[in-house]
């Protein structure tokens, strides 16, 4: 991925992945599984090389999927550095029925400014908060996570905590009010056919 980013070809890889995701969603929905969704990443480079809105909405229309089942992950940094046009495009996605997720929330220096300036649907709390090993840092990190979770409730947003690896973390996060988790505690990344065999 780093090579694709350095050469400016990441947008081609992203578009390829978007189409694969939409194709899979179309298959699932044809089989009656409207409850499943896939999150895809949008990088800053994508905005430079193509009309992201037209590309994604065209795929959704071509394969006739429910827009809300294709969730769009945009990093906090990408939103912070985005142009007015790019931020407007993100809002167009929301108006068209897509859900926008801020990925790696809390990794930047202006996290709360991001929330002030941008309407989104989901915050994904950066896994760095759970990777702290020093006891005094763990307590501080969990306090920050608790604050973010409380904030999402006030703003009416959903929240996902990334990097969950232990039952203890699950228990603490559940007490704080987080109900959606992502991490190796559940599974490492697996091929889609293996996912279907295990969970469908």
Language-model-detected regions and their locations in the chain:
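PAS-family sensory/regulatory domains
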Residues: 2-3, 132
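EAL-family c-di-GMP phosphodiesterase catalytic domain
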Residues: 43-50, 69-84, 96-200
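Catalytic core of bacterial c-di-GMP phosphodiesterases, primarily the EAL and HD-GYP domains
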Residues: 3-86, 163
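Conserved functional hotspot residues or short segments at active or partner-binding sites
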Residues: 89
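Regular, well-ordered alpha-helical segments
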Residues: 26-30, 95, 175
């Amino acid at each position: 991925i780093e090579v694709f980013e350095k050469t400016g070809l990441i947008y081609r890889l992203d578009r390829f992945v978007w189409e694969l995701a939409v194709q899979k969603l179309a298959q699932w929905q044809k089989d009656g599984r409207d409850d499943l969704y896939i999150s895809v990443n949008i990088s800053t480079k994508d905005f430079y090389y193509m009309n992201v809105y037209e590309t994604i909405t065209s795929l959704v229309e071509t394969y006739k999927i429910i827009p809300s089942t294709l969730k769009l992950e945009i990093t906090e940094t990408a939103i912070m550095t985005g142009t007015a046009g790019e931020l407007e495009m993100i809002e167009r996605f929301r108006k068209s029925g897509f859900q926008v997720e801020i990925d790696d929330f809390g990794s930047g220096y202006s996290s709360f400014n991001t929330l002030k300036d941008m309407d989104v649907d989901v915050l994904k709390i950066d896994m760095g908060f759970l990777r702290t090993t020093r006891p005094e840092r763990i307590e501080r990190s969990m306090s920050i996570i608790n604050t973010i979770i409380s904030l999402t409730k006030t703003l009416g947003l959903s929240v996902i905590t990334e990097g969950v690896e232990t039952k203890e973390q699950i228990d603490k996060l559940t007490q704080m009010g987080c109900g959606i988790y992502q991490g190796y505690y559940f599974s490492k990344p697996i091929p889609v056919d293996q996912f279907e065999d295990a969970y469908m």
